[in-house]
Amino acid sequence: MANNSPALTGNSQPQHQAAAAVTQQQQQCGGGGGATKPAVSGKQGNVLPLWGNEKTMNLNPMILTNILSSPYFKVQLYELKTYHEVVDEIYFKVTHVEPWEKGSRKTAGQTGMCGGVRGVGTGGIVSTAFCLLYKLFTLKLTRKQVMGLITHTDSPYIRALGFMYIRYTQPPTDLWDWFESFLDDEEDLDVKAGGGCVMTIGEMLRSFLTKLEWFSTLFPRIPVPVQKNIDQQIKTRPRKIKKDGKEGIEEIDRHVERRRSRSPRRSLSPRRSPRRSRSRSHHREGHGSSSFDRELEREKERQRLEREAKEREKERRRSRSIDRGLDRRRSRSRERHRSRSRSRDRKGDRRDRDREREKENERGRRRDRDYDKERGSDRERDRERSRERSKEQRSRGDGEEKKHKEDKEDRRHRDDKKESKKKHSRSRSRERKHRSRSRNAGKRSRSRSKDKSSRHKNESKEKANKRSRSGSQGRTGSVEKRKREHSPSREKSRKRSRSQDRSHKREHNDSKDQSDRQDHQSSQSGEPESQEKEHKSKDETV
């Protein structure tokens, strides 16, 4: 009930000039029926408020999901953008107002309006009527558009969908104000899929107000106080019984005249009523039976003419509907042809543009290919040059490396030869030096021993001579001794011995220096064999 509060203030008594005209027509109809309630005057806005869920239109979820998933709603109705296009679609496509198409729901032999199932129960193929009803809801109709639906004169199904739109979207407190002036509407329509359930607009509206069920779905619930109020008001408005005889014919004629008028504002054409004829006939009864018979014949003739006029009117209506359908189809075909021609022209222009673009793209691609080819050829040339250079450099480098290796090997052979020669020369020099040293050492030892022995002998001799001659000779012996000692032979021998000692010392020092140098070189070169040989030679010398 929270959703009802904003709608109650803004939409208390909806009315329209067309509805007022319809009520005036019903009031003008004579005989039997109760008087309709006049429309309440008042200003109301054109914006029509919605009641309940503003996204689902208060439809059953199963029906709504089938509507949204149907290809008819997604493809064909999506192209319809205006109110008039949807109304034309209703005129050509709707043949019943049941939510499901015939034979699409399996109710397992259940009978009745709902098939023994409350709500939806089982799904099926949703009808075009409910798809178009939800399409109207997506357009957010105004008050004027809704009144145009419920007062439409071309098809009763347009009016039926308008009333169903009101039942689903308007507050329950406003339903009586919407439906009151149409409760006695006698226009027939077949509401069941496949036919077989003909009812009038008034009967359909009474079922909308008193019952929640509509075939295999449910309308939005009406609050209990509002429902009681509606029931009481319906009791005060009983159904009109169809009249027999001339008055029934007159009622049908007036209904036809009302249907004939496109807008409800048009005044009804004045016709001769059967009441007037009856009053005139009673007034003329006193003149005789002949006048009464004449009057009766005239009345029969008038009824026959009226029937013929009705048949003509029906034929005209059929021809008009056919002509309208043809005109609409022709206009649509013309529009389609124009749109197709325009689309063809546009497509031709687009094709030309696309061709030009493709040509330009091809030119650009050719240029790019040529440029790429040139760049590729240049790159290949550069690569070949670089390869040749690298090959030359590699060949040069290989030759240089070979030469360098050969030079290194030659140097190594030379160094090895030199070292071997040096080793042989060193070994020979060492052997020679060793031999010379050994010889010199023998000579020195021999010379030293000889000198010592000679000196010892000389000293012993001198001592003996001194002892023997000390007493006899005296000073002469001493002088001679001095002379002998200072003789040149003695001095020469002494000098020789001293020079030999000096030379022997020098040779010994030279040999030591050479041996030290050789040891130093051998330690630096790291040759263990030479070191062992030198050690052996040193040991031998030692």
From Swiss-Prot:
Sequence ranges of Low complexity compositional bias: 13-28
Function description: May be required for pre-mRNA splicing.
Record keyword Nucleotide-binding present: no
Coiled-coil regions, chain positions: 293-322
Keywords recorded for this protein, A-Z: Acetylation, Coiled coil, mRNA processing, mRNA splicing, Nucleus, Phosphoprotein, Spliceosome
Biased composition (Basic and acidic residues): 244-256, 292-328, 346-419, 448-465, 478-491, 498-520, 530-542
Record-listed Phosphoserine modification sites: 5, 289, 291, 319, 321, 445, 470, 472, 478, 523, 525, 530
Location in the cell: Nucleus
Name of the protein: Pre-mRNA-splicing factor 38B
Pfam families, sorted: PRP38
Modification N-acetylalanine, positions: 2
Biased composition (Basic residues): 257-285, 329-345, 420-447
Similarity-based family: Belongs to the PRP38 family.
N6-acetyllysine: modified positions: 228
GO biological processes: mRNA processing; RNA splicing
Gene that encodes it: Prpf38b
Main location: nucleus
Compositional bias segments (type: Polar residues): 1-12
Organism of origin: Mus musculus
InterPro entries: PRP38
